[in-house]
A protein has these predicted regions:
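Conserved catalytic or regulatory cores that recognize and/or transform ribose-phosphate-containing ligands
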Residues: 1-179
Length: 179
């Protein structure tokens, strides 16, 4: 069975110690869900950067922010898939992770539960952007982990109408698979 590594990118620093859970709860949910999928193809490993270094520790485990950056970017470079939560669309760390994944041709799946007006590059660097964690997780399971064929009603997926490239047509059912 092959290993499949997924890195969870998204804002962390803006939430601080008082709101650390906002940067971590979605990651814990995704990690638990993805690692418990029953797939015969892969052993799924999900990287939550908060598991190694986080901003809520009273005594930080890291000596410098460079150490944190190097570890996180190394994890991105060795991932098979990156999931980015646009919970802080201005996070420089998240944008660096997104750009490196895109440059290395690592697929990036986005989540934007607030349906913000994302920068066009943020949109274009993602294969898909969803407005729901659960829809995104279903897609990752079907498309990347099990390769099952499923029908998806596309009006449930996030579509940024200001984007010049329409990822999803507005009024039909789309069939996706990755054969």
């Amino acid at each position: 069975m092959q290993d499949f590594q997924i890195y969870l990118a998204g804002g962390m620093g803006k939430f601080g110690k008082d709101r650390f859970f906002e940067s971590n709860n979605w990651r814990k949910y995704c990690k638990t869900t993805l690692e418990n999928y029953d797939t015969n193809r892969y052993k799924v490993h999900v990287i939550n950067p908060n598991d190694y270094f986080n901003f809520a520790d009273e005594t930080p485990r890291y000596a410098s922010h460079k150490e944190v950056m190097e570890l996180d970017l190394n994890r991105v470079r060795h991932s098979d898939l990156v999931i980015i939560n646009f919970n802080d669309m201005y996070s420089l760390g998240s944008m660096a992770e997104l750009a490196i994944a895109y440059d290395r041709r690592i697929p990036v799946i986005g989540v934007d539960t607030s349906e913000q007006n994302l920068h066009p590059w943020q949109i274009e660097m993602c294969q898909r952007i969803f407005n729901s964690l659960d829809l995104m997780l279903d897609y990752v399971e079907d498309y990347y982990l099990t390769w099952e064929r499923r029908w998806v009603k596309n009006n449930r997926m996030y579509y940024n109408k200001s984007s010049t490239s329409k990822r999803i047509a507005e009024s039909s059912w789309w069939f996706y698979n990755c054969y």
